[in-house]
Amino acid sequence: MQIILLEKVANLGNLGDIVKVKDGYARNFLIPNRKARRATKDAIAEFEVRRAELEKVAAEKLAAAQAVGEKLNGQTFEITQKSGVDGRLFGSVTNGDVAELLKKAGYEIEKAQVRMPEGPLKMIGEHGVQVALHTDVLVDVTVNVIGDHA
């Protein structure tokens, strides 16, 4: 299916690009989330009329994400979990736990925005975590897992 991207989509393209994607990806994700429209002649003409408005909105989103990123970059957050004597956690710290921790600190972060390269945290200590605020804004934060010996 041919679609017009209404915003930048990772691994796909930028605002205004006409790309071919699988039908299911377009119907189930891109179109319902208002990231794209079908590339019909009418839609292309309407997009060209609204292009400046959409670019302005995209620039505002990027600026807002960069402002939050400057505040968030390099910060350290602490979370307490039950652990054994050897430093291993009972359970783990997931991206949902980190997102909840950031929300309590006053940041609007969804769990899908938290990237944990090594998977869930299973040991006490400091761990690096990435937060994707925008497709162009990746921020590194440190999560210090404190063990609560049971």
UniProtKB/Swiss-Prot annotation:
Domain of life where this protein originates:
Bacteria
Q: Indicate what this protein is called per its UniProt record.
A: Large ribosomal subunit protein bL9
* A biological process term (GO) from this entry: translation
What is the protein's species of origin? Burkholderia pseudomallei (strain 668)
Similarity field: Belongs to the bacterial ribosomal protein bL9 family.
Q: Which NCBIfam families match?
A: L9
User: Which PROSITE patterns does the record cross-reference, listed alphabetically?
Assistant: RIBOSOMAL_L9
* Gene Ontology cellular component list: ribonucleoprotein complex; ribosome
Report the protein's function.
Answer: Binds to the 23S rRNA.
Q: Which UniProt keywords apply?
A: Ribonucleoprotein, Ribosomal protein, RNA-binding, rRNA-binding
In the UniProt record, what gene is named as encoding this protein? rplI
Q: GO: which molecular function terms?
A: rRNA binding; structural constituent of ribosome
Query: Pfam families this protein is in?
Result: Ribosomal_L9_C, Ribosomal_L9_N
